[in-house]
């Protein structure tokens, strides 16, 4: 028994050691999309998540054909966003500055999603938020940035004078938002410990 294998196959001790050391795949964070769930279960995107069946896959495929200032294809293996990764990314962006207090627009979110996808390999279906009006909480547990409406008087003040840019998100008067609210990214450390989105909208997490 096993004689033919022992004669023909080499390298088993090395493979056995790799198997012994292999760590289980990290669980995707609560709130990620269907494609990330696919990556969590199978380690790759399956036929159930293609450009024809998944809006995030279709969007990503379209971005790969455009010039966005940096290569879109990831430098590392594709994987789902995890709680720890979302938390680490939140701390990094808070420490480096630039996102906290920035006026939100879909284009800006796209740029951030593509940068994270390219440098870290996290599939861009993790940065989703609860619906408005009011504060929008992140669906992905561990992502510590929420979207907060800007007070109307601050919008008016920012738009005074002739120097304001009509294409700036502040001047768009919430055109990206169904509620027509101008939103700003705000860091909130409580989001690391309390999953507000799940408490407010448990229906989003039935398949998690």
From Swiss-Prot:
One of its GO terms (biological process) is symbiont-mediated suppression of host antigen processing and presentation of peptide antigen via MHC class I. GO terms for molecular function: GTP binding; SH3 domain binding. GO terms for cellular component: extracellular region; host cell Golgi membrane; host cell plasma membrane; membrane; virion component. Residues 71-80 are annotated as: SH3-binding. It is a lipid-anchor. The virion-associated Nef proteins are cleaved by the viral protease to release the soluble C-terminal core protein. Nef is probably cleaved concomitantly with viral structural proteins on maturation of virus particles. Monomer; cytosolic form. Homodimer; membrane bound form. Interacts with Nef associated p21-activated kinase (PAK2); this interaction activates PAK2. Associates with the Nef-MHC-I-AP1 complex; this complex is required for MHC-I internalization. Interacts (via C-terminus) with host PI3-kinase. Interacts with host PACS1; this interaction seems to be weak. Interacts with host PACS2. Interacts with host LCK and MAPK3; these interactions inhibit the kinase activity of the latter. Interacts with host ATP6V1H; this interaction may play a role in CD4 endocytosis. Belongs to the lentivirus primate group Nef protein family. Factor of infectivity and pathogenicity, required for optimal virus replication. Alters numerous pathways of T-lymphocyte function and down-regulates immunity surface molecules in order to evade host defense and increase viral infectivity. Alters the functionality of other immunity cells, like dendritic cells, monocytes/macrophages and NK cells. This is Protein Nef. It comes from Human immunodeficiency virus type 1 group M subtype B (isolate MN).
């Amino acid at each position: 028994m096993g004689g033919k294998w022992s004669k023909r196959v080499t390298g088993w001790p090395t493979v056995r050691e790799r198997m012994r050391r292999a760590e289980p795949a990290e669980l995707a964070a609560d709130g990620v999309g269907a494609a990330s769930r696919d990556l969590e279960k199978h380690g790759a995107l399956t036929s159930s998540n293609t450009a024809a069946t998944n809006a995030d896959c279709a969007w990503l495929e379209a971005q790969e054909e455009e010039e966005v200032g940096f290569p879109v294809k990831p430098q590392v293996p594709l994987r789902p966003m995890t709680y720890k990764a979302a938390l680490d990314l939140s701390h990094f962006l808070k420490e480096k500055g630039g996102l906290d207090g920035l006026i939100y627009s879909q284009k800006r979110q796209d740029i951030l999603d593509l940068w994270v996808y390219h440098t870290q390999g996290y599939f861009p279906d993790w940065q989703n938020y609860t619906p408005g009006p009011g504060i929008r909480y992140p669906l992905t547990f561990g992502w510590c940035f929420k979207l907060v409406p800007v007070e109307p008087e601050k919008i008016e003040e920012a738009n005074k004078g002739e120097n304001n840019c009509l294409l700036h998100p502040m001047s768009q008067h919430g055109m990206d938002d169904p509620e027509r609210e101008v939103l700003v990214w705000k860091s909130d450390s409580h989001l690391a410990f309390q999953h507000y989105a799940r408490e407010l909208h448990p229906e989003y997490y039935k398949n998690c």
